[in-house]
């Protein structure tokens, strides 16, 4: 996981039961409505018990027909940081009148449990390696705060063009914030999702 080895993921994926694979994805709200009141695109997971075996490797490494939004990715990472409990996203902290008095305040709300605390802790430990010595270490090692997360690269054509992802959270022993960043055509711009996420984390801890 730390080195984002596609061959390892694909090999493991070939041992999975396709029906169980789909049900696990749907437990994480793929093909489902998100507990969010705003506008969003639903994430899609196409593998089923009837899918051909050659569809598995591409899906396991995050390619193929799987689609996920930054919002959904951040929600899953938030659940990992929160011992498996999914939180309902909200975009407005409070509403004030013209005198500056708060007339309505919004608060975090739980939206269910999507994994056990043990499963969340295992994933957290794996993702620490990404930022300590793996694919994200060039961005997140040696900081005054610790980041746990996962890098990702999504090719979208046959010419090598790709989007760069990073999703993670800070200070895993007592989590602060989750950041999900995606940069389009990162192979052209040279700007990665991890670089963008680092700027957000730095801004948060510099305040």
Residue spans of the language-model regions?
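Short, gly/Ser/Thr-rich active-site loops of penicillin-recognizing serine hydrolases
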Residues: 102-104, 194-207
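Conserved active-site neighborhood of the chymotrypsin/trypsin-like protease fold
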Residues: 6-8, 189, 194
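Beta-lactam-recognizing serine transpeptidase/beta-lactamase-like catalytic domain environment
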Residues: 1-184
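Short amphipathic alpha-helical face segments that pack within enzyme cores
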Residues: 69-75, 192-199
């Amino acid at each position: 996981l730390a080195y984002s080895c596609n061959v390892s993921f694909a090999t493991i994926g070939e041992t999975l039961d396709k029906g169980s694979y789909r049900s696990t994805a749907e437990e994480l709200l793929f093909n489902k409505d998100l507990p969010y009141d705003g506008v969003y695109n639903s994430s899609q997971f196409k593998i089923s018990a009837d899918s051909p075996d050659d569809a598995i490797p591409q899906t396991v490494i995050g390619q193929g027909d799987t689609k996920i939004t930054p919002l959904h990715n951040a929600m899953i990472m938030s659940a990992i940081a929160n011992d498996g409990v999914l939180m309902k996203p909200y975009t407005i902290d409070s509403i004030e009148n013209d005198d500056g008095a708060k007339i309505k305040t919004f608060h975090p709300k739980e939206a269910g449990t999507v994994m056990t605390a043990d499963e969340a802790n295992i994933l957290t430990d794996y993702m620490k390696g990404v930022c300590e010595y793996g694919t994200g270490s060039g961005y997140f090692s040696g900081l005054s705060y610790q980041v746990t997360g996962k890098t990702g690269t999504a090719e979208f054509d046959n010419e090598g063009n790709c989007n760069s992802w990073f999703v993670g959270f800070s200070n895993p022993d007592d989590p602060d914030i989750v950041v999900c960043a995606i940069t389009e055509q990162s192979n052209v711009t040279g700007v990665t999702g991890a670089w963008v996420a680092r700027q957000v984390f730095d801004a948060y801890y510099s305040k």
